[in-house]
Design a protein with these regions (language model features):
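ATP-dependent adenylate-handling ligase core
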Residues: 1-3, 9, 30-40, 91-94, ...
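Phosphate- and divalent-cation-binding pockets in alpha/beta enzyme and binding domains
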Residues: 3, 23-24, 157
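Adenosyl-5′-phosphate
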Residues: 10, 14-16, 47-253
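Short acidic/histidine-rich active-site segments
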Residues: 12-28
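A mobile, often basic/glycine-rich helix-loop segment
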Residues: 24-50
């Protein structure tokens, strides 16, 4: 994203971005995932947990147990949905789908907006987000899910509302998730950096992450490096860099 913004900045000082369109109009896969719909938790965690599995979890087991992250997530979920008022005559299904929309608008998208703001401002690019206009969000928010997905597809309402303004190829295009790096050299580079980190056994990151899990991911044969393993290595290296840069006092009690 940073490199994309950097390239845009060579030609323009302002750009438009689509953050919040998926949240408002229902574009993410978890909106259509029955398991994620039924779960009494943040729906994206269901999908991420299924897609990434345990390989993405690199924190030490004793630390995760002490932090009691499951209770933290459960408390956060209850707080998030507590303020969603049920509409008169609203079915159980429609109420659940509106809660899912609410969760994405109040919890999920703000992470994306923060990422967008930081990456764009780093190169001096102003990125505007028209789908975050409060008038649009307020107008569409209470639209029933049966209308938002009237043809069984993602963002049905948005596509139909703009059908006479966009090419048919765009109208028919299936949502493509944000791309991840596919070059195997990237995974190998992550492994090399992780091996360098493992060679520093006294590094404070190992007070937080499971050294054995990092070791297994760092020494796995290249064709066997899953996206989950990559994610675990990325988290470890990011955490190590943060500790190196800011040297915080981390008190584990």
């Amino acid at each position: 994203l940073y490199l994309l913004f950097q390239a845009i900045r060579e030609h323009s000082t302002v750009a438009l971005s689509g953050e919040s369109a998926d949240e408002v109009f229902g574009g993410y896969l978890q909106f259509f995932d029955e398991e994620a719909r039924r779960a009494e938790t943040f729906p994206w965690l269901v999908r991420f947990g299924r897609d990434f599995g345990d390989d993405a979890d690199v924190l030490r087991p004793d630390l995760t147990e002490a932090l009691d992250l499951e209770s933290y997530v459960a408390d956060g979920y209850r707080t998030a949905v507590a303020g969603v008022r049920r509409l008169d005559g609203e079915s159980d299904f429609e109420y659940r789908m509106r809660r899912i929309c609410h969760l994405h608008l109040t919890r999920f998208v703000r992470v994306l907006l923060d990422r967008k703001d930081r990456a764009s401002m780093a190169v001096g690019l102003e990125v505007r987000v028209p789908y975050c206009d409060h008038r649009l969000v307020e107008y569409v928010y209470n639209a029933p899910w049966s209308l938002k997905s009237f043809d069984g597809r993602e963002k049905s309402l948005l596509r139909e509302a703009t059908a006479d303004l966009i090419p048919k190829s765009v109208y028919d295009r299936v949502k493509s998730p944000y791309p991840s790096t596919q070059d195997p050299k990237y995974a190998i580079a992550l492994q090399d950096h992780a091996k360098d980190l493992l060679a520093r056994p006294a590094h404070p990151v190992f007070d937080l992450v499971d050294r054995e899990r990092v070791h297994r991911a760092a020494h796995r044969d290249s064709p066997q490096i899953t996206q989950a393993s990559r994610r675990g290595l990325e988290r470890t290296l990011d955490l190590a860099l943060w500790l190196d840069m800011y040297a915080p006092d981390v008190l584990l009690t």
